[in-house]
Amino acid sequence: MAREKIVVAGGTTKSWKLLLGLRIFAFMATLAAAIVMSLNKETKTLVVATIGTVPIKATLTAKFQHTPAFVFFVIANVMVSFHNLLMIVVQIFSRKLEYKGLRLLSIAILDMLNATLVSAAANAAVFVAELGKNGNKHAKWNKVCDRFTTYCDHGAGAIIAAFAGVILMLLVSAVSISRLLINSKNFSTTATTTSVV
């Protein structure tokens, strides 16, 4: 007796569960990256100069809003989180709907765009984080991570979560594309069968 695959919404039940699990993990990773980076702030009082023996101190604050790349990072991760949340809700509550043609294609394209978006944001944040950690001797930019260690550590955690989100979104895109291909093969097989009869 041959075991039949149950086809659900453009693929098998196994691919449906895999896609749902990947989306949930991608949602959690990108949301964690956005939250950690958006709450990233550290205030320090530093000696900026000395006059004679009297130190002159200044209180400085490092915030993610001070760097446009980190602002882009937060916005992009929030957008990808929202996309995944919306797709999770649609996937759970419309399980019995038929996903054909344009719907599957648009979902696959949106998944690829979101994978690209979170990848660009993570790479922009890595560039700025590297400048913060090592500075740039040629441009005479000083490093800041030797003074704002907590800020840099939280930023590194957010970047790691974002790269986990990138990997998960690439897997989501691969599964979405495979579901699209499976659906197009099923459609072409059905169309060939009906035209032969």
Curated annotation (Swiss-Prot):
<feature type="transmembrane region" description="Helical">
    <location>
        <begin position="107"/>
        <end position="127"/>
    </location>
</feature>
<keyword id="KW-1133">Transmembrane helix</keyword>
<feature type="topological domain" description="Extracellular">
    <location>
        <begin position="39"/>
        <end position="69"/>
    </location>
</feature>
<feature type="topological domain" description="Cytoplasmic">
    <location>
        <begin position="178"/>
        <end position="197"/>
    </location>
</feature>
<dbReference type="InterPro" id="IPR044173">
    <property type="entry name" value="CASPL"/>
</dbReference>
<feature type="topological domain" description="Cytoplasmic">
    <location>
        <begin position="2"/>
        <end position="17"/>
    </location>
</feature>
<dbReference type="Pfam" id="PF04535">
    <property type="entry name" value="CASP_dom"/>
</dbReference>
<keyword id="KW-1003">Cell membrane</keyword>
<feature type="transmembrane region" description="Helical">
    <location>
        <begin position="18"/>
        <end position="38"/>
    </location>
</feature>
<feature type="modified residue" description="N-acetylalanine">
    <location>
        <position position="2"/>
    </location>
</feature>
<protein>
    <recommendedName>
        <fullName>CASP-like protein 1B2</fullName>
    </recommendedName>
</protein>
<feature type="transmembrane region" description="Helical">
    <location>
        <begin position="70"/>
        <end position="90"/>
    </location>
</feature>
<dbReference type="InterPro" id="IPR006459">
    <property type="entry name" value="CASP/CASPL"/>
</dbReference>
<dbReference type="GO" id="GO:0005886">
    <property type="term" value="C:plasma membrane"/>
</dbReference>
<keyword id="KW-0007">Acetylation</keyword>
<keyword id="KW-0812">Transmembrane</keyword>
<dbReference type="InterPro" id="IPR006702">
    <property type="entry name" value="CASP_dom"/>
</dbReference>
<comment type="subunit">
    <text>Homodimer and heterodimers.</text>
</comment>
<comment type="similarity">
    <text>Belongs to the Casparian strip membrane proteins (CASP) family.</text>
</comment>
<keyword id="KW-0472">Membrane</keyword>
<feature type="transmembrane region" description="Helical">
    <location>
        <begin position="157"/>
        <end position="177"/>
    </location>
</feature>
<feature type="topological domain" description="Extracellular">
    <location>
        <begin position="128"/>
        <end position="156"/>
    </location>
</feature>
<feature type="topological domain" description="Cytoplasmic">
    <location>
        <begin position="91"/>
        <end position="106"/>
    </location>
</feature>
